[in-house]
Swiss-Prot record:
UniProt KW Repeat keyword: yes
Protein name: Zinc finger and BTB domain-containing protein 32
Zinc fingers classed as C2H2-type: ranges: 350-372, 378-400, 405-427
Region Disordered, annotated ranges: 111-179, 285-310
Name of the gene this protein is made from: Zbtb32
One Pfam assignment: zf-met
Subunit: Homodimer (via PTB domain). Interacts with the N-terminal of FANCC. Interacts with ZBTB16. Interacts with GATA3.
Tissue and organ distribution: Isoform 1 is testis-specific and is not expressed in lymphoid organs such as thymus or spleen. Isoform 2 is expressed in both B- and T-lymphoid cells.
Alphabetized UniProt keyword annotations: Metal-binding, Nucleus, Repeat, Repressor, Transcription, Transcription regulation, Zinc, Zinc-finger
Homology family: Belongs to the krueppel C2H2-type zinc-finger protein family.
The protein's role, per its UniProt record: DNA-binding protein that binds to the to a 5'-TGTACAGTGT-3' core sequence. May function as a transcriptional transactivator and transcriptional repressor. Probably exerts its repressor effect by preventing GATA3 from binding to DNA. May play a role in regulating the differentiation and activation of helper T-cells.
Length: 465
């Protein structure tokens, strides 16, 4: 059986903005995309509505393995026009749509491939069943019961004859002739529907009719997010969500925008790589300052990158790579990369020698170890209360008036070290004892003076907090 061209119906055809842009193209285009030496003018607003990865205005080039003919088909689909694919082009178009993030086109290709696989299994029986169910559902909502019994009976008898001829087909019969006797074309089905009055209302009243191939594919393809908005008025679509697209794509060019040297094409070896942040879907434009024109170089200095970012950046640039010459950058769209999850031994290297409990910080392990030893090195200077860690003593000091700092001259309390410093400016330094420091105003004492500089309960760390 010869392969027929595959027809994909674009879901963007009902949008006024896309239709207007397609009618005006190449006028008012603020984007010029270079693919394989060919230039394609487009509107960044229309491209952004189809895929966030394409919503980049200016002059840029695709360096991914996408042919100019395939990219032209993608633009035709995005601008609301149907495309016809020859045998063998469906797979390349699906891969290109997946790489560029055009989800509607990718789903349409997958749906067409699935239908083609089902047709290859048993095309005659499947098409006949679809046509029969569709006509049965259409006649269910038309005319009186007496009028629809006869056509249904005739259609069933005709279907049985066709099925019997399919079963008892001669071995030498050509497959295309057999397919022609078994299939009912979509034009014949639509002609039969239009002959009835109120066919549109009957179709809406059908429980679940199956559409014939090529007739109602528009209802099977999901509409994009910006086409689901209700209409504001007659003939006007409420497509303000496109107009309120985030400002990272910039404003379109006007007729008065001067053409500067930024439109000059840069050589392939001078394109500046720039990674795409998938987690936030934002173009990392702030990495241009420290980037170099050497291919494969990092977008920014390694001193500002985390270790896992340096590791993944050193693996090279994969995925869809585009070069924005007007912004002097190359957009890299790698696959989702996440930092490796740390192992428990690496995240909690300190363990208790008594119970084996692990901790990420050493002072946490030391504080926990005092549970086994019963040591309480921190004591309150106002009462006999003692604590094994600094945080518990800080909470205890709040019971004395939430003023853990006390002036040695007037016994006034202060909530923080800064307020105590401001308070001490009101006293004469001559009244203070020799060797006095501001840290001695904190109302706690530790029985471990040798670790005063490094322990979490030291006056230095407490004053800093």
């Amino acid at each position: 059986m010869p392969q027929t061209p595959t027809r994909l119906v674009s879901p963007y055809g009902s949008d006024r903005l896309v239709q207007l842009a397609a009618r005006l193209r190449p006028a008012l285009c603020d984007t010029l995309i270079t693919v394989g030496g060919l230039e394609f003018p487009a509107h960044s607003l229309v491209l952004a509505g189809a895929s966030p990865r394409l919503g980049c205005r200016g002059r840029w080039a695709l360096v991914e393995d996408i042919s100019p003919s395939t990219f032209a088909q993608i633009l035709t689909f995005v601008y609301g026009e149907s495309i016809e694919l020859q045998p063998g082009e469906l797979g390349d178009l699906e891969e290109a749509a997946k790489a560029l993030g055009v989800q509607a086109l990718e789903e349409a290709c997958q749906r067409a491939q699935k239908g083609k696989d089902e047709d290859e299994l048993d095309p005659g029986l499947k098409r006949h069943q679809q046509s029969e169910d569709f006509m049965r559902g259409s006649e269910r909502g038309l005319g009186s019961p007496g009028e629809k019994q006869k056509p249904e009976k005739d259609f069933r008898s005709n279907g049985r004859e066709q099925e019997m001829s399919h079963k008892h087909k001669a071995p030498g019969e050509r497959p295309e002739m057999a397919g022609a006797t078994r299939m009912m074309s979509s034009e014949e089905v639509m002609r039969g529907i239009e002959s009835h009055k109120g066919s549109e209302e009957s179709l809406r009243g059908c429980p679940d009719p199956l559409s014939p191939p090529g007739s109602l594919l528009t209802s099977l393809i999901p509409r994009p997010w910006w086409a689901e908005v209700p209409r504001l008025g007659e003939g006007q679509s409420a497509l303000w969500s496109i107009l309120l697209w985030p400002s990272r794509y910039g404003a379109p060019f006007s007729h008065s925008t001067p053409i500067t040297a930024a439109w000059q094409v840069r050589p392939q070896d001078q394109r500046i790589p720039l990674t795409l942040n998938h987690s936030k879907a934002l173009w990392s434009q702030n990495q241009l300052a420290s980037s170099s024109p050497t291919p494969g170089s990092f977008p920014q200095g390694t001193e500002s990158l985390s270790p896992w970012q340096i590791e993944t950046s050193g693996q090279g640039f994969t995925g869809t790579l585009a070069t924005c010459v007007s912004q002097e950058r190359t957009l890299n769209c790698p696959s989702h990369q996440h930092p490796p999850l740390p192992s428990p031994a690496r995240s909690r290297p300190y363990s208790c020698s008594v119970c084996g409990k692990r901790f990420s910080l050493k002072h946490q392990m030391e504080t926990h170890y005092r549970v086994h030893t019963g040591e309480k090195p921190f004591s309150c200077s106002l009462c006999p209360q003692r604590s094994r860690d600094f945080s518990a003593m800080t909470k205890h000091l709040r019971t004395h008036g939430a003023a853990p700092y006390r002036c040695p001259l007037c016994r006034a309390g202060c909530p923080s070290l800064a307020s105590m410093q401001a308070h001490m400016r009101g006293h004469s330094p001559s009244r203070l004892p020799p060797g006095w420091t501001i840290r001695s105003t904190f109302l706690y004492s530790s029985s471990r003076p040798t670790r005063a500089s490094s322990s979490p309960g030291s006056p230095t760390s407490s004053a800093a907090t």
